[in-house]
From Swiss-Prot:
GO terms for cellular component: cell outer membrane. This is Parvulin-like PPIase. Gene3D superfamilies: 3.10.50.40. It comes from the Bacteria. The keyword Membrane applies. The keyword Membrane applies. Residues 138-231 form the PpiC domain. GO terms for molecular function: peptidyl-prolyl cis-trans isomerase activity. It catalyses: [protein]-peptidylproline (omega=180) = [protein]-peptidylproline (omega=0). The lineage of its organism: Bacteria, Pseudomonadati, Pseudomonadota, Alphaproteobacteria, Rickettsiales. PROSITE patterns: PPIC_PPIASE_2. It is found in: Cell outer membrane. Keywords: Cell outer membrane, Isomerase, Membrane, Rotamase, Signal.
Length: 282
């Protein structure tokens, strides 16, 4: 089972949670008691069923995760009580922040509704076909890297690798990319020139490598990289369902850009700043 932190970071939602016949009390505190159903109901929107997993009841979680859930739930209740006893919600600063938050939430809801109502089946199909055409015949590679601060450090790591050093162990020891270091520096699969992936300098060097080949140090805005290609294979063509999130995001970005542009035009927006290439006084 995935770690609790992974479950909470997911944006997927359970459609329903089935509770057992017995709604057990799992904790008590001065303010009352906590039941399994309360925990599951509280965190239901944040739970995610990973592939092959079935989380229907509180008992499906490992004991250590059950304890974490209970503590988070009770701590939220205790903090809520502390807020109620304080005067924080009546302060001017809080009210201003609350109003700003409400405005932001309202804008997000407005945009979400506008985007949803303007994505048609034809738009989706056209964008999907364009997306698939762009993937046909392309290759994807599985890459790992070791990120360090300076060229000197990169050369040191490269020398260790040249002398038979283990890439996985060196990534764990030296890499500044903590998100991948613990997994041997593995980033995953990338496709050349695919928007939203990696910086061009990294991609160009990576795609020039053979499988199991290690690069010379590569400089990017993040630092210095030692790159290793672990695998190469053709890019699989996703079904419409598999590509739905990607296509929806592409269409949403296009619709949003046009919507904002139209609003600016209707408002007759004129920026009064000097041109970017204009000369300023010395």
């Amino acid at each position: 089972m995935k770690k609790l932190s992974v479950i909470f970071l997911s944006v997927s939602m359970l459609s329903s949670i089935a509770f057992g016949d017995e709604d057990k009390v799992v904790a008590t505190y001065k303010g009352g008691e906590v039941k399994e159903s309360q925990i599951m109901q509280e965190f239901k929107p944040q739970l995610n069923l990973q592939s092959g997993e079935t989380i229907k009841n509180f008992d499906d979680f490992p004991l250590q995760d059950q304890e974490k859930l209970i503590k988070i739930y009770v701590n939220n209740l205790l903090l809520k009580e502390e807020v109620a006893k304080s005067s924080i919600t009546s302060s001017k600063e809080f009210q201003e922040k609350l109003e700003n938050a409400k405005n932001q939430l309202a804008q997000q809801e407005l945009l979400a509704n506008y985007i949803k109502s303007n994505i048609t089946d034809k738009m989706f199909d056209d964008e999907y076909n364009k997306y698939v055409d762009n993937l046909k015949g392309k290759e994807q590679i599985k890459v790992a890297h070791i990120l360090v601060k300076s060229q000197k450090e990169a050369n040191t790591v490269k020398t260790k690798l040249s002398k038979g050093g283990n890439f996985t162990k060196l990534a764990e020891e030296f890499s500044l990319d903590k998100a991948t270091a613990s997994n041997g520096g593995i980033i995953g699969y990338i496709i050349l020139n695919q928007p939203g992936q990696l910086v061009p300098e990294f991609e160009q060097k990576a795609f020039a490598l053979k499988v199991n080949e290690v690069s010379t140090p590569v400089k990017t805005s993040f630092g210095w990289h030692i790159i290793k290609v672990l695998e190469k294979k053709p890019v699989p063509i996703p079904t419409k369902e598999e590509a739905k999130v990607t296509i929806d995001n592409i269409l949403a970005a296009e619709i949003l850009k046009q919507y904002i542009s139209d609003l600016e035009a209707k408002a007759d927006l004129k920026i009064m700043l000097p041109k970017a290439n204009s000369k300023t006084g010395s």
